[in-house]
């Protein structure tokens, strides 16, 4: 086949993003390509990921360099073995829109090179094929000095002997691109976003090729600038281009580095040498009044003046950005005002399920602290403040100004779900992640494919979990999985879940009567709790999942209504409302009931599917039925399970409403049939639960 594209991908410690990158190639509408992945001495699992895909797809080829030699060497190595008529460069932490390669190859026609447009990872390209009128022509050949997202003819690369200068670790792209300046007058560009750039700012995550030691990068940039201006001294176009590129580099990178780091003495001399050169040559890039003054201060090596100008520039930029929306204003205040205030060492912020509930382990830890009379300033985050809770905690609305203020000032964060990525931890901040269940479904880096509404699920999760100082585990099974699937290496509290303390309390009978009365459930009726999970592939948008009730309430009421009532409890991700109006007195929708642990306590039978609720409920040693009507799809396509559903569960799998009714009518026989398996299950998953997890964690974290 003609028009084969060789995609060259250097790889260095990007296991977090690599699968997403490779999957974006496999999913391309255009199939005539080869991917050459050069493992540049990675110390993580990148090489094994590459080798695994290489076995599955003959278009994927790997090269292992053993020792890290830098991106320039890796790309040159890829060029040496590429067999395609076209060359394309991709970073291993980035990904492509489904139609990216097809758009490039179908529109390059008689041209030697074609450019694509970049996009940040969280935006959608919304492109479809065939595409007409998606090409524009530009005289500005290189708006940035990156080889990424450019499709080159191999004949052009060979004719001009285009290679990357391996003397440069960070800024080698321009040595490949500069020879093209005089080669053509205009460059075609795809107008739609086709390349998804992964911008990462987490200092603990693997670094992309554009994020490293700032002093070394600036010094290398200056060195390369002077070398190239010398090489192209007789080429006015090249000199003008290099001058324009430096100004862009200053505006997009150097300014921010100098504003955040005190490295003036290390780089001012170098920067001044470039500005002095630019002052004697022409450039076409428009620059603002502030930039002109800053460059003048750099030229004159006036550090004091430069500091003042950059400080003023930062204030104006922040003010301008803040005026563009309330949330942007709040995030700006968080980053530049609130986190600069003294940390409140006796303040704890609690949040459960994105502020939807007063529940779960954060609730139990909070109540343990107030029972112990520990003198802290307690803040509870709710989507709708005004809940009736014990103690004197201040309630704040999630994502409000007060929320950002207290998140910035509190020493302690306690949450069972994820806190927004925009909230960067400050030094000294302690984040206790309680988590929300023993895992049945595969998690994060144990998942081969992600079918959720968020295509960046793994990368987002990794960045957010780097903030966790402590993580709670309910059993050794969970500890092993969390360490691997979350890549978590900090302290794990292995005491069981605080939320399950109530299931081991001495006054369970009194509590059951109280909770039944609160829900208007007759004390003489037995309770069936149905608690299903969401389906990853059925959603309206990220965080809002569809759910279709397969539970035949009418039949259940007819067959079991004299003895039982049913509580329906959907996962907090599920957006659909369950209507139980026709079953008043029999079916109760308790999806918005704050604390599911209290529902466990009053439930005589649990019916679930792939929700992890049964791990907690098993503490009570009461019967569990598993309504798994779509088992094959969920097990084999969506997530996959950590345990064998057919052999390890402490109760039967049922697939129809007939089986549910029959099992409930014969629940004593079911319990007897599964007793041995239940005992084994209890020992494995509930053995750490003794009703004192909250007390132990209180003593360890808040001593």
Can you name each region flagged by the protein language model?
Residues 396-412, 418, 572-615, 648:
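Donor nucleotide-activated moiety binding/catalytic core segment of transferases
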Residues 585, 612-685:
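Catalytic binding pocket for nucleotide-activated donors in carbohydrate/polymer assembly enzymes
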């Amino acid at each position: 086949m003609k028009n084969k594209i060789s995609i060259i991908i250097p790889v260095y410690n990007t296991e977090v993003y690599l699968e997403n990158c490779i999957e974006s190639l496999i999913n391309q509408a255009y199939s005539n390509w080869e991917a050459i992945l050069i493992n540049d001495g990675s110390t993580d699992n990148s090489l094994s990921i590459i080798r695994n895909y290489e076995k599955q797809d003959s278009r994927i080829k790997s090269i292992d360099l053993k020792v890290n030699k830098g991106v320039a060497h890796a790309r040159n190595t890829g060029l040496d073995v590429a067999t395609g008529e076209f060359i394309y460069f991709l970073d291993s932490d980035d990904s492509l829109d489904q139609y990216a390669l097809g758009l490039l190859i179908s529109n390059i026609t008689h041209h030697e090179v074609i450019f694509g447009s970049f996009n940040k990872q969280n935006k959608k390209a919304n492109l479809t094929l065939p595409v007409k009128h998606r090409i524009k022509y530009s005289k500005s050949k290189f708006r940035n000095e990156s080889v990424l997202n450019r499709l080159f003819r191999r004949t052009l690369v060979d004719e001009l002997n285009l290679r990357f200068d391996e003397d440069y670790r960070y800024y080698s792209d321009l040595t490949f691109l500069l020879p093209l300046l005089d080669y053509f007058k205009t460059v075609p560009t795809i107008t739609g976003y086709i390349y998804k750039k992964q911008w990462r700012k987490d200092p603990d995550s693997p670094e992309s090729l554009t994020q490293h030691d700032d002093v070394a990068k600036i010094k290398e940039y200056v060195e390369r600038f002077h070398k190239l201006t010398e090489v192209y001294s007789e080429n006015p176009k090249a000199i003008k281009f290099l001058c324009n590129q430096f100004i862009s580099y200053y505006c997009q990178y150097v300014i921010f580095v100098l504003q955040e780091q005190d490295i003036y003495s290390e780089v001012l001399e170098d920067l001044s040498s470039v500005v002095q050169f630019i002052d004697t040559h022409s450039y076409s890039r428009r620059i603002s009044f502030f930039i002109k003054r800053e460059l003048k201060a750099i030229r004159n090596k006036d550090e004091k003046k430069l500091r003042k100008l950059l400080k003023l520039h930062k204030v104006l930029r922040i003010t301008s950005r803040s005026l563009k929306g309330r949330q942007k204003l709040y995030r700006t205040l968080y980053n530049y005002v609130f986190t600069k205030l003294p940390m409140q060492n006796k303040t704890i912020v609690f949040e459960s399920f994105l502020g939807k509930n007063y529940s779960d382990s954060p609730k139990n830890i909070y109540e343990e602290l107030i029972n112990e009379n520990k003198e802290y300033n307690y803040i509870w985050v709710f989507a709708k403040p005004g809940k009736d809770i014990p103690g004197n905690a201040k309630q704040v609305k999630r994502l409000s100004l007060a929320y950002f203020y207290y998140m910035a000032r509190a020493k302690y964060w306690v949450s069972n779900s994820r806190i927004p990525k925009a909230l960067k931890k400050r030094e000294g901040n302690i984040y206790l992640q309680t988590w929300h269940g023993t895992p049945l479904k595969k998690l994060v880096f144990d998942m081969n494919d992600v079918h959720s509404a968020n295509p960046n699920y793994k990368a987002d999760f990794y960045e957010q979990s780097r903030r966790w100082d402590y993580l709670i585990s309910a059993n050794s099974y969970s500890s092993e999985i969390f360490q691997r699937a979350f890549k978590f290496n900090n302290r794990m509290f292995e005491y069981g879940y605080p939320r399950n303390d109530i299931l081991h309390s001495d006054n369970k009978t009194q509590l059951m009567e109280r909770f039944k009365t609160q829900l208007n459930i007759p004390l003489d009726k037995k309770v069936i709790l149905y608690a299903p999970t969401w389906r990853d592939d059925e959603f309206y948008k990220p965080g809002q999942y569809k759910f279709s009730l397969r539970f035949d309430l009418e039949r259940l009421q007819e067959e079991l209504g004299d003895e039982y009532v049913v509580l329906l409890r959907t996962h907090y991700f599920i957006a659909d409302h369950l209507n139980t109006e026709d079953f008043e007195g029999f079916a109760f929708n308790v999806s918005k009931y704050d604390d599911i642990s209290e529902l466990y306590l009053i439930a005589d039978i649990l019916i679930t599917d792939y929700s992890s609720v049964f791990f907690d409920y098993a503490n009570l040693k009461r019967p569990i039925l598993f309504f798994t009507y779509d088992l094959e799809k969920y097990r084999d396509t969506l997530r996959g399970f950590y345990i064998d559903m057919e052999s390890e569960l402490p109760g039967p799998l049922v697939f129809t409403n007939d089986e549910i009714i029959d099992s409930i009518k014969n629940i004593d026989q079911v319990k007897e049939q599964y007793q041995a398996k239940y005992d084994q299950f209890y020992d494995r998953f509930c053995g750490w639960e003794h009703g004192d997890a909250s007390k132990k964690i209180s003593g360890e974290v808040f001593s």
